[in-house]
Design a protein with these regions (language model features):
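N-terminal helix-turn-helix/winged-helix DNA-binding helices
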Residues: 2-8, 47-81, 85, 96, ...
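An alpha-beta-alpha
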Residues: 174-217, 336-353
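Flexible loop/hinge segments that line or gate small-molecule binding clefts
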Residues: 130-173, 193, 267, 293-305
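Append "Primarily bacterial transcriptional regulators
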Residues: 12-13, 43, 287, 348
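Hydrophobic alpha-helical segments within soluble ligand-binding/sensing domains
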Residues: 163-189, 209, 241-251, 269, ...
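Short coil turns linking two alpha-helices in DNA-binding domains
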Residues: 19-24, 36
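Short beta-strand elements in bilobed, periplasmic/extracellular small-molecule ligand-binding domains
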Residues: 93-104, 208-241
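Flexible loop/turn connectors
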Residues: 249-359
């Protein structure tokens, strides 16, 4: 006779039509969470009927930690934009007695897949992506089991919650500003612009739309990027800074006729500024430079970078609040049948790195 299949909380959740997190919390007698007597009875009766063996006593503290743990998936931590997001997530999580665990993928699809396999078997409070997931279908599958929130430009086909920035609008806003200053030849400096990197694509598209709306020749926009192989070969923790530095040096060696450099984010823009300074150029006298994200370093007096603000700290807090509210509202609902979408409007922050083009 074959060995009988072990009944899990997932089996019970599917049997009665409740979320796995709800079933797990009831069976583990989770503190500080209340469920109706009807819901508790449904779960306990189903567990008994299916033959569920509660082994929570063997790892009670670790199970409790998992139920109250939010996993944050970041590409890397060298960009202070991600550090700010994580700080805001931790800040808000403490209010709801959540702990936060951060993992990095370096935007590697295989690494992301391995984490998916691990996370799909855990009873977590929720997952927050700080960048668009490489495999949308797998993130959608996770959302059927627990709250999943992405921060940033929302990818097509996603069926999970999001706290968004309209990247096209952000790119258009900056492009419009530079054009109004008189910059009609602009180089867009970016890490690889590929299908999955939608924030980079959207910001670049926004710049193009700004040119089109003002009747300017889009051929005067130069996209300066590198291959994925080149990007992955950069041996430094400050990878985005290095991208900005190397691509700007290439543009200068090629004799660019652009009067402004627009970087896909502030860390890349800092690399642009360093390259220009190393070659003896003055900013904004010789070249204007701008970025996106308004990280802390951008506001320092010696840098004073023109950029786009999009409420980074608030977005991290909102992501945690979405997870918390999902647990409150879905105690009697199967899975998570509704999707929340919040969008922040970009704001132009004008500082000292931009001005009228050189004569």
């Amino acid at each position: 006779m074959g060995k009988r299949k072990k009944i899990t909380t997932r089996d019970i959740a599917e049997y009665i039509g409740l979320s796995q997190s709800t079933v797990s919390m009831i069976l583990s007698h989770k503190e500080n969470v209340s469920f109706s007597k009807e819901t508790q009875d449904i779960v306990l009766q189903a567990a008994k009927k299916l033959g569920y063996k509660n082994e929570i006593h063997k790892s009670k503290s670790s199970q409790k930690d998992l139920h109250q743990t939010i996993v944050v998936i970041a590409p890397h931590l060298s960009n202070s934009y991600y550090a700010t997001l994580i700080h805001s997530i931790v800040y808000e999580a403490k209010k709801h007695n959540y702990s936060v665990f951060t993992i990095t993928t370096m935007r590697n699809a295989q690494q992301e897949d391995s984490y998916y396999e691990l996370l799909s078997n855990l009873d977590l409070a929720g997952i927050i992506y700080l960048y668009p997931p490489t495999k949308i279908s797998k993130a959608n599958a996770l959302f059927k089991r627990m709250p999943v929130v992405s921060i940033g430009d929302k990818p097509q086909g996603s069926r999970f919650d999001s706290v968004e920035l309209n990247g096209v609008r952000a790119g258009h806003l900056m492009g419009e500003y530079l054009l109004n200053l008189g910059h009609e030849k602009i180089t867009f400096i970016s890490a690889p612009v590929m299908g999955k990197e939608i924030s980079r694509i959207h910001r670049y598209e926004g710049l193009i739309h700004a040119f089109e709306d003002q009747g300017k020749d889009v051929q005067n926009i130069q996209l300066k990027t590198m291959s994925l192989a080149q990007y992955e070969s950069i041996q430094t923790e400050n990878i985005e800074y290095q991208v900005g530095y190397e691509l700007t040096m290439e543009a200068l060696e090629e004799g660019t006729d652009s009067t402004a450099f627009l970087a896909n984010n502030d860390m890349t823009a800092l690399g642009v500024l360093s390259a220009l300074k190393s070659e003896g150029y003055k900013v904004p006298k010789d070249f204007s430079v701008a970025g996106f994200d308004n990280i802390l370093m951008s506001s320092l007096p010696d840098i004073s970078l023109t950029t786009i603000e999009h409420a980074t700290f608030l977005k991290g807090k909102e992501a945690v609040d979405i997870i918390y509210k999902k647990h409150l509202k879905n105690n009697m609902q199967k899975s998570h049948p509704y999707i929340l979408r919040l969008e922040y409007e970009p704001e132009l922050i004008i500082r000292k790195t931009t001005g009228k083009p050189r004569k």
